[in-house]
Amino acid sequence: GEDGIGGLVRSRGVGEGDKRQAMGHEGMRSSLASRDAIADTVELTMRGHCYDAIVGLAGCDKSLPGMMMAMVRLNTPSVFMYGGSILPGRLNGKDVTVQDVFEAVGEHQAGNLSDEALRTLKRVACPSAGACGGQFTANTMACVSEAIGLALPNSSGAPAPYESRDHYGMASGQAVMNLLEKNIRARDIVTLKSLQNAARIVACTGGSTTAGLHLPAIAHEAGIDFN
């Protein structure tokens, strides 16, 4: 909303394919390309409507680096906000996530897990909105968004269903207006030093190896050699 921010808000959406449905066949060839398509779409939307600044909300895998690539390419005042991770499910007194489902599918195929046990796990493993509950691409790049300086501190840690996200949404709007007023642009923030900091965060958190693809792509948009 516009209350307390002072800017004229306009919202636009960008689609992303689900790579989990693309695994094991030709569809997976489209996964990385979708990142670049997202960056292109955000760029065209911003340029086509002559927007002055952007608060970019992204929630799953390729949409995060795609959004950050667009911010750096456009070099406008930019604040990134993560859509948030899913909450864990509970089964037999333990937290379970989609990662447990991955393992269970293998156990089922090996004949070590019954149909009913697999169905029971699948019903409880993903109980809320949000990105996959593991340090996969989405949560890794969410950590990167803070380390790189595009997201507000602690904003990427709030799970998708938490009401604290309302606060971060408003704060992100206020932050982007402050950046606009002071003419602080994305490339003023995304530097070689911030990229190195982001790489350290990926290593320290046991992040996804896909960051090895996405960090150089973000750097490339800023004209920084980061290989």
Predicted regions and their residues:
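Extended, hydrophobic alpha-helical segments in both membrane/secreted and soluble proteins
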Residues: 63-64, 77-78, 197-198, 208-218, ...
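Anionic-ligand anchoring segments at beta-strand to alpha-helix junctions in alpha/beta enzyme folds, i.e.
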Residues: 15, 20-35, 210-213, 220, ...
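Active-site cavity-forming subdomains of large catalytic enzyme subunits
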Residues: 31-197, 202
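Short alpha-helical "patches" and their helix-cap loops
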Residues: 155-167, 213-227
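Short glycine/serine- and small hydrophobic-enriched flexible loop segments
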Residues: 9, 146, 203, 216-221
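Short internal beta-strands
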Residues: 15, 80-83, 216
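Short, small-residue-biased leader/transition segments that mark boundaries at the very start
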Residues: 3-18
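Short alpha-helical patches at coil-to-helix transitions and adjacent helical residues
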Residues: 11, 138-141, 212
